[in-house]
């Protein structure tokens, strides 16, 4: 604290000794020999980094007020897809309206490394930063230095004269302040007449910025292009952010009938055509095609190529499918309306890795149907995302943000949401009417928590103005006038019914209060992708699978075994018999009855002895078979054991249940495949040995005996 007080008061001292950084090279691949094979990383002194972090936290609280809507990076509540969606929608609007335009993708050369300190400090003064703040920034910049680590030995000190250090928490925020001036410069040039204004109906803003990725919309006129190039040169001279025109590109929109070569003669960059890639996603004029989403499949296959599925247990492959393969398409699915064929191809790769490891997949290798696998854990699945439903949940964020933050640049334009998304959003939200200007009369759930388009489909189909707001529709009963071309005899009853419902709520519009929306699928009332995804499985039957299988302390292979048991997918003799495969019919342990998974674990006399001995040894009477004799399913028996156990012992009882069932299965396999003689004492002893190993591994829920049932 004394050091921070010293820095706060700018009391002098040699801060340069604490504001150093070490630059090391990390290899990008094995056998790296060239400079291009290494990635430099800067390790900043912890004191300087802490001071910078404090300043960045304070600046982050006000950065939204200082930055124009054109910049969407390094800010809370904004994301990369905002910029992509705005640019794509603007391109499509220009294309549909047959408006001639050019999209310029600019490359800023070594953006972070070239920022002028003099420009930055002057900009902070213009933005109203107090002198003390500017002095702190000047101190951090002027005393910074770096040295290169060569074989672990630091080299000569390199003093900095410009630029912002990567790895510094404050650098990203300072950088977007610097580059945001480009947007304001072009807006000023447009206002003064130096640049012709873009079509207002199609492009709200001329510029879209994401960090140093800049897109500019401009009219395809040589004078405008030359003026823009001059402004970019002046901007680079003042800020140090020079545009590398050789790596920049111009993409024409509806410019097939003009001489682009003459217009772009001074541009110096390349000319491209749609589709193009912007921020890692394809921008297309028409419908997206599978070939434009091939990069998603390529990334998944590249991951699979480096994995050795044969060397992984099924539980490990499940984790990789859930956490890696299913996460790869998330970025694209948020902003794009993907094709069903893409989901099929991704599911094929996920299914193959899960069930067939590195071999070709076939139905015979899939132990459980994919529909069940791609179901939430609490409903009996493996919790692997159903990508089609997950994509719906991801896209609902656009409908939610359009309500919550209507100042985003893309609001009012097309979103990737389809009619199914709109219906799901309406079913999961409730709208409170204020002035009625934000709520859709037909699509919003403002009357009794339901959509009028669903409650009165005939009226909705007959309406000629389906996009009216509640405010517009109720003014003079315009919603009734919109039905004037319909067959009044068929819809008269519904008109009367809807009119009565509207009058019954006594709705009074308040011009001073905006409409509000609440997400009904979460107690906070705020949207989340997780709750939107879960809501799509509301019709499924909730069970105790998550608590009985996935939330217990046990190795992954035992959890997978329990899942197969609860799914009745273990290869017992009854399943073999149903398929007409060779089997010995009888239970290998007792040799009395047809072997089924239920008989093997819950009815077999040998298994019952094991449960009895385990209950006595562990002091857990919940494991006594007398408690589940009336149950008819494996899930029912397991639930009865858990509910019978004392509340404080239930976690340990779940682990004990899993371990005993696992060793019964191992003993059964030894009898079938090795011809071993059954010995229930061997099963109990094996359970005791594993319990000791689990305790050493950190299973606190079974550290002590359970004691009697309470």
Annotate each predicted stretch with a short phrase.
Residues 1-4, 9-10, 14-22, 27-58, ...:
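A helix-boundary/hinge signal
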């Amino acid at each position: 604290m004394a050091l921070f007080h010293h820095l706060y008061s700018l009391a002098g001292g040699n801060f340069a000794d604490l504001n150093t950084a070490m630059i090391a090279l990390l290899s990008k691949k094995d056998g790296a020999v060239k400079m291009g094979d290494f990635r430099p990383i800067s390790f900043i002194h912890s004191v300087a980094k802490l001071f910078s972090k404090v300043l960045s936290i304070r600046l982050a609280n006000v950065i939204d007020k200082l930055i124009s809507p054109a910049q969407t990076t390094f800010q809370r509540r904004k994301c990369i897809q905002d910029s992509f969606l705005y640019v794509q929608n603007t391109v499509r609007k220009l294309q549909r309206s047959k408006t001639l335009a050019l999209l310029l993708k600019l490359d800023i050369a070594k953006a972070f490394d070239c920022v002028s300190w003099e420009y930055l400090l002057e900009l902070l003064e213009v933005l109203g930063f107090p002198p003390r703040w500017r002095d702190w920034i000047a101190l951090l910049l002027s005393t910074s230095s770096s040295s290169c680590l060569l074989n672990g030995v630091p080299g000569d000190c390199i003093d900095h004269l410009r630029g912002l250090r990567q790895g510094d928490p404050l650098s990203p925020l300072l950088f977007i302040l610097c580059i945001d001036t480009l947007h304001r410069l072009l807006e000023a040039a447009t206002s003064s007449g130096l640049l012709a204004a873009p079509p207002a109906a199609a492009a709200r803003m001329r510029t879209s910025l994401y960090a140093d990725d800049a897109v500019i919309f401009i009219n395809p006129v040589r004078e405008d292009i030359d003026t823009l190039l001059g402004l970019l040169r002046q901007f680079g001279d003042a800020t140090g952010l020079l545009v590398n025109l050789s790596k920049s590109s111009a993409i024409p929109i509806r410019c097939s009938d003009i001489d682009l070569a003459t217009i772009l003669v001074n541009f110096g960059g390349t000319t491209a055509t749609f589709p193009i890639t912007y921020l890692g996603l394809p921008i297309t004029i028409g419908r997206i095609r599978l070939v434009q989403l091939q990069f998603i499949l390529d990334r998944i296959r590249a991951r699979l190529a480096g994995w050795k599925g044969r060397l992984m247990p099924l539980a490990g492959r499940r984790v990789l499918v859930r956490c890696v393969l299913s996460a790869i398409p998330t970025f694209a699915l948020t902003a794009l309306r993907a094709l069903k064929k893409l989901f099929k191809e991704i599911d094929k790769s996920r299914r193959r890795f899960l069930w067939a490891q590195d071999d070709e997949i076939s139905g015979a290798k899939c132990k459980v149907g994919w529909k069940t696998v791609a179901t939430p854990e609490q409903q009996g699945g493996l919790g692997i995302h159903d990508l089609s439903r997950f994509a719906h949940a991801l896209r609902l964020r656009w409908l939610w943000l359009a309500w919550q933050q209507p100042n985003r640049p893309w609001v009012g334009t097309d979103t990737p949401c389809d009619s199914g998304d709109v219906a799901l959003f309406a079913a999961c939200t409730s709208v409170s009417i204020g002035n009625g200007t934000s709520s859709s009369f037909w699509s919003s759930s403002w009357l009794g928590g339901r959509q009028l388009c669903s409650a009165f489909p005939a009226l909705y189909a007959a309406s000629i103005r389906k996009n009216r707001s509640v405010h517009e529709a109720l003014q003079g009963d315009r919603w009734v006038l919109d039905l004037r071309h319909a067959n009044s005899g068929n819809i008269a009853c519904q008109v009367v019914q809807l009119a009565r419902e509207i009058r019954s709520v006594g709705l009074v519009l308040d011009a001073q209060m905006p409409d509000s929306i609440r997400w009904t699928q979460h107690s906070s009332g705020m949207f989340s992708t997780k709750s939107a995804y879960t809501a799509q499985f509301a019709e499924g039957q909730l069970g105790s699978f998550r608590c009985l299988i996935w939330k217990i302390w046990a190795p992954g292979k035992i959890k997978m075994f329990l899942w197969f048991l609860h799914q009745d997918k273990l290869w017992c003799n009854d399943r073999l018999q149903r398929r007409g495969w060779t089997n010995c019919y009888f239970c290998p342990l007792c040799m009395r009855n047809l072997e089924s998974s239920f008989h093997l674990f819950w009815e077999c006399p040998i298994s019952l002895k094991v449960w009895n001995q385990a209950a006595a040894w562990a002091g857990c009477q919940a494991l006594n078979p007398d408690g589940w004799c009336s149950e008819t399913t494996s899930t029912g028996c397991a639930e009865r054991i858990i509910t019978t156990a004392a509340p404080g012992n239930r976690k340990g009882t779940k682990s004990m249940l899993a371990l005993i069932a696992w060793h019964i299965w191992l003993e059964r396999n030894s009898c079938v495949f090795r011809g071993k003689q059954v010995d229930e004492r061997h099963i109990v002893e094996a359970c005791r040995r594993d319990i000791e190993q689990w305790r050493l591994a950190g299973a606190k829920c079974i550290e002590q005996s359970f004691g009697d049932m309470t």
